[in-house]
Amino acid sequence: MSRYRGPRFKKIRRLGALPGLTNKKPRAGSDLRNQSRSGKKSQYRIRLEEKQKLRFHYGLTERQLLKYVRIARKAKGSTGQVLLQLLEMRLDNILFRLGMASTIPAARQLVNHRHILVNGRIVDIPSYRCKPRDIITAKDEQKSKALIQISLDSSPHEELPNHLTLHPFQYKGLVNQIIDSKWVGLKINELLVVEYYSRQT
């Protein structure tokens, strides 16, 4: 299944706010109207919608998400929390959380077009897994800095998660540590996602 490129508002109307996908928010009450039209949700549908939320927020294909679930299962600790850590430490998501890109698709474009350096080297893989002490900067070109400045200017200036530090005038972000689960940028029940895949495989 390919990455979603359709109307974004349609997705947030059904699944709720997905800040990684779009800055738009569903109108108040639209979720309640959808629920009343569709009646009581089955357990399968509840798990499916949580999985879809995760997939669309982080901009993943079905195959990519399944791969992350399998990696998380093999790691020590809670599978759900490890899964969220893996997704949050992706380079495209780190750029989004720093405010250097307005959405995760915008961050992916910055990376694909080689505007971003990690530890002084160009990285053009959006799924690159950032590590503590990584230094993320804009390429030293006017176009790269201008693109990031637009995002920084329009950023809502929310409190940065404690695993990141931003130096906006230097177009630089630092990864201080692996993200703590309480700073994850999406309201989600990750256990339902794990359950969804455990029943599929």
Swiss-Prot record:
Region (Disordered): 20-44
Domain S4 RNA-binding: 89-150
Superkingdom per UniProt: Eukaryota
Keyword tags: Chloroplast, Plastid, Ribonucleoprotein, Ribosomal protein, RNA-binding, rRNA-binding
PROSITE patterns assigned: RIBOSOMAL_S4 (PS00632), S4 (PS50889)
CDD domains listed in its UniProt record: S4
Cytoplasm keyword on record: no
Subcellular compartments: Plastid, Chloroplast
One of the protein's GO biological processes: ribosomal small subunit biogenesis
InterPro entries: Ribosomal_uS4 (IPR022801), Ribosomal_uS4_bac-type (IPR005709), Ribosomal_uS4_CS (IPR018079), Ribosomal_uS4_N (IPR001912), S4_RNA-bd (IPR002942), S4_RNA-bd_sf (IPR036986)
Gene Ontology MF, one: structural constituent of ribosome
GO CC terms in record: chloroplast; small ribosomal subunit
Subunit record text: Part of the 30S ribosomal subunit. Contacts protein S5. The interaction surface between S4 and S5 is involved in control of translational fidelity.
Sequence similarity: Belongs to the universal ribosomal protein uS4 family.
Known function: One of the primary rRNA binding proteins, it binds directly to 16S rRNA where it nucleates assembly of the body of the 30S subunit.
Protein name in the entry: Small ribosomal subunit protein uS4c
Gene: rps4
